[in-house]
Design a protein with these regions (language model features):
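Acidic, low-complexity cytosolic segments
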Residues: 80-95, 106-226
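Terminus-proximal functional modules
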Residues: 17, 21-24, 28, 32-35, ...
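Acidic, negatively charged sequence signal
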Residues: 48, 72, 80-83
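Amphipathic alpha-helical coiled-coil segments
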Residues: 59-72
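Short, charge/polar-rich alpha-helical segments
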Residues: 2-24
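Short, Lys/Glu-rich amphipathic helical modules
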Residues: 29-56
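Generic short beta-strand
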Residues: 100-101, 108
Length: 226
């Protein structure tokens, strides 16, 4: 089983090398996430193990990427070495992932909804149908974003078996979109056998984006994360 503590942080080098080493660290963690997906797909770990380990890796990546973008990229090493339970990303005026819903491409019905996905089905169904029609006309069409009347944004992420619909509080950044696209790819790979079955049991699926939604949907109370 993948152990999150075995993710090595490079030894400090020259300041000008900090950003490059940070990117190398992120690449190493991405490799570990891919192995984690395969372990769940092969039945080697359970859902709880998958969710907690995937969440820890994703938070490492987001923290390092944020600090690399700041004025002193060398700070990322110290952040990675801190406890995962007490590490908090700096508060910024960024979009929050309010909720996500996964739809079965075969039936057009929702498989699971996470977070506070307060969007009426009467609105989602025609939008999803329109999106699929447009995607069918464009080979390998990618994700689409649309702004709602209340200022929130809906993001449609296509997959082989499912379509992920993500609800953001504001317009998401390119990095946020890349994150949910990767999470959706991992969702389909981890649950490949279950999604190919005639009947899909949502309680047997692993959801890489579960923690992504929960952490951003919960109000700030200053307490430690569980």
């Amino acid at each position: 089983m993948v152990n999150p503590s075995d993710t090595p942080a490079p030894d400090p080098g020259h300041p000008q090398d900090s950003a490059r080493e940070g990117q190398e660290f992120i690449a190493q963690v991405h490799q570990k996430m891919s192995r984690l997906v395969q372990e769940f797909a092969n039945g080697a770990i359970n859902r709880t193990q998958f969710h907690r380990l995937y969440d820890r890796y994703q938070r490492q990546i987001m923290t390092v990427a944020q600090l690399i973008a700041e004025s002193d990229p060398s700070m990322w090493r110290d952040a990675v070495m801190e406890s995962e339970d007490t590490l908090h990303l700096k508060k910024r005026l960024t979009a929050k992932a309010v909720g996500m819903s996964v739809y079965d491409n075969r039936s057009g019905m929702p498989i699971e909804t996470l977070g506070e996905f307060a969007v009426e089905a009467d609105l989602i169904v025609p939008m999803l149908s329109s999106y699929r029609s447009a995607a069918a006309e464009i080979f390998r069409a990618g994700m689409r974003n649309t702004e709602m009347e209340n200022g929130q944004w809906l993001c449609f992420v296509p997959g082989k078996h499912t379509t992920l619909i993500a609800l953001f509080s504001l317009e998401p950044s390119d990095n946020q979109l890349a994150t949910i696209e990767r999470m959706h790819q991992d969702f389909e790979e981890a649950n490949r056998a279950a999604l190919e079955a005639e009947h899909i049991d949502p309680d047997r699926l692993a959801y890489p984006f579960y923690a992504f939604v929960q952490h951003r949907a919960r109000p700030d109370n200053g307490g430690d994360e569980k």
